């Protein structure tokens, strides 16, 4: 179930490139331009097949979420719905966009609300999420290549004082 835990972030932009092979914007872009709001639904590996169905080249007006047997539900802070099965949703308001031709745009949005499924929250008060448990993946290039976030590493950021003390600057 998508979260009872909801917390605000310092506004950060989300970007999406939205091409359509038939020389027009995809419905997603058209809807963003019309409503000036959108939900970015992050996808775990268990949702890969459903996510792939939502990328079908359906004609305008077809609800791809329904085709994929996904459930929509009201968003917390925007009018467009979110995907109930998504472990993380960023509810966004349009800041600006760049159009490159008649079917491709980069959309920049301000995150109004971030919603995370309870099972993936380590510390709600501090906004700490169990990222490995999300098992996220994303599109890379072409129409069929994806990457996972299963290989992770942590690095401690150096401080200026530390570098000065070590004679590096």
Regions found by a protein language model. Give the residues of each.
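Basic, polyanion-binding surface patches
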Residues: 1-169
């Amino acid at each position: 179930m998508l979260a009872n835990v909801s917390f605000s972030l310092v506004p950060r932009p989300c970007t999406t490139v939205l091409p359509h092979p038939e020389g027009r914007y995809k419905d997603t872009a058209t809807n963003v331009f019309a409503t000036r709001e959108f939900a970015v639904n992050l996808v775990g590996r268990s949702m890969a097949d459903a996510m792939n169905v939502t990328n079908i080249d359906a004609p305008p007006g077809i609800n791809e979420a329904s085709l994929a047997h996904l459930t929509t539900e009201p968003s917390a802070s925007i009018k467009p719905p979110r995907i109930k099965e998504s472990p993380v949703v960023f509810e966004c308001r349009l800041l600006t966009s760049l159009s490159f031709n008649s079917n491709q745009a980069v959309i920049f949005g301000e995150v109004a609300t971030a919603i995370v499924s309870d099972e993936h929250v380590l510390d709600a008060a501090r906004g700490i999420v169990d990222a490995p448990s999300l098992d996220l993946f994303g599109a890379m290039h072409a129409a069929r290549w994806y990457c996972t976030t299963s290989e992770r590493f942590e690095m401690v950021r150096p401080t200026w004082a530390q570098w000065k003390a070590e004679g590096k600057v």
